Amino acid sequence: MIHVEVVYALPTEQVVFKLAVKADQTVQEIIEQSGVLERYPDIDLVVNKVGVFSRNVKLDATIRDKDRIEIYRPLLADPKEIRRKRAAQAKKEAAKK
């Protein structure tokens, strides 16, 4: 048995499920076993990306002892577009001075 964590972060809270699992289980099996899908039914493993310590992994990947499996939420806004808007606003404010 190995020890892993399944983490899901929301804007208002972060939940961590600590589990002892068999070493040959896949990421998907561990996520299903954790109970996070029952607690947060909006998670769709087809849509949501998953990772281990901030590195994207496939659902059929195996994990190691003390790994942290992270379930990522989709981005609500395009980071490039946000930077463009922020730069345009800063340019307008600089022109007013």
From Swiss-Prot:
InterPro entries: Mopterin_synth/thiamin_S_b, RnfH, RnfH_sf. SUPFAM superfamilies: MoaD/ThiS. Pfam families: Ub-RnfH. It comes from the Bacteria. HAMAP family: UPF0125_RnfH (MF_00460). Belongs to the UPF0125 (RnfH) family. This is Protein RnfH. It comes from Aliivibrio salmonicida (strain LFI1238). The lineage of its organism: Bacteria, Pseudomonadati, Pseudomonadota, Gammaproteobacteria, Vibrionales. The gene is rnfH.
